[in-house]
UniProtKB/Swiss-Prot annotation:
Pfam families: AMP-binding (PF00501), AMP-binding_C (PF13193). Belongs to the ATP-dependent AMP-binding enzyme family. CDD domains: FACL_DitJ_like (cd05934). Keywords: Ligase. It comes from Escherichia coli O139:H28 (strain E24377A / ETEC). GO terms for molecular function: carnitine-CoA ligase activity; crotonobetaine-CoA ligase activity; medium-chain fatty acid-CoA ligase activity. This is Crotonobetaine/carnitine--CoA ligase. Pathway: Amine and polyamine metabolism; carnitine metabolism.
Amino acid sequence: MDIIGGQHLRQMWDDLADVYGHKTALICESSGGVVNRYSYLELNQEINRTANLFYTLGIRKGDKVALHLDNCPEFIFCWFGLAKIGAIMVPINARLLREESAWILQNSQACLLVTSAQFYPMYQQIQQEDATQLRHICLTDVALPADDGVSSFTQLKNQQPATLCYAPPLSTDDTAEILFTSGTTSRPKGVVITHYNLRFAGYYSAWQCALRDDDVYLTVMPAFHIDCQCTAAMAAFSAGATFVLVEKYSARAFWGQAQKYRATITECIPMMIRTLMVQPPSANDRQHRLREVMFYLNLSEQEKDAFCERFGVRLLTSYGMTETIVGIIGDRPGDKRRWPSIGRAGFCYEAEIRDDHNRPLPAGEIGEICIKGVPGKTIFKEYFLNPKATAKVLEADGWLHTGDTGYCDEEGFFYFVDRRCNMIKRGGENVSCVELENIIATHPKIQDIVVVGIKDSIRDEAIKAFVVLNEGETLSEEEFFRFCEQNMAKFKVPSYLEIRKDLPRNCSGKIIRKNLK
């Protein structure tokens, strides 16, 4: 079923400007409280100016341009400005350091970079020490270093006309973006995303939360992440709604921002929910207009109930990954919700559970969650320049192996168990990290938790727990292990405990387990 009909991203923005004109499209709030607003007409003009800027710098269809930016209007300008001229955006996680950023530059073949003064010293070093194809850098800040090959993004953009100067033929099959995965267990892979992928994501995600043009979708998720782009931004723009992009998440500021912008939809990850719950209760906790909170794994039922009760919201569960573009399994608008189910397969998708021999399993049996879509349309096209990795996860007929374990019930509701790589093998038993983390998270002194497997010469793997305590709390090993023994089977009780100030996370809030031993 083709729901796009040849409408690439350039056509989308021209149509949105015509239809919605002076209606507010984008609101950006910086960490310093500076707010920028753009109507659909104004935003399309800024996108055109940015496209013209890239053209004057020699960027043509098929060229790759890297963005290393925090949430800001310039990210949106660049994203769609590049798409309008058929160039390809390569967003870089703003938390990455020199080695990882250089690796993405090298492996994406990016020839131009847009970044800020905050990250510029790192890229100076990369240009001096690493072999990349980078030939120019645009800085979004006003003050510029006196270096060759560096220019002001804002000054160049403001010199451009508001109408597009270069409009090569485009197809919805053209690549719009190469988004490198977070790489929590290995080197990141470049997920190739087409114009069709992004257009479909907008319509699908708008359907998922029943988005209307009078909605306000607020997100604090990073713009370089698939959730912000495909679940939030593309959904809001496709519906003609208002998209609010906050530069940085703050638990203290979040509800005030939701109230100020009269947000009706937002998205949360477990880290956000836990930090919001430790804020002092306020009479304003329920003074908001949120209709849905899009939610991504993983949370205990006790935590979910406490959050919904305190803030008067309901969670709309959505399950997906960079390769699926959107939440391909999730709660449906107007449908029943069955916690802790992650929902049912969305329209245009099939889902099933398979065993280790790639055979479908009946309801109730645990296996790998597999998704069927159309590569380059409803799921990613391929891994950039990595056919071996593509073939490992994507079958020729469109079945995608997620690497996650789960099961489904007789009514087609799916249940997430864990990432396959997060299953601990202990003395012949398979132990789910997520299961243990959900149990341990109910301890009143614990704010954050992750468990990992470490080598054990006798039992294959031992279990180690890393915990972050609530402010002012202390926790003895005796108290911790006694709690575990009272709440889980003996073979699941961790052997080791380490108390830390924080846990290493990537841009989407996922624990970087490879950094924990």
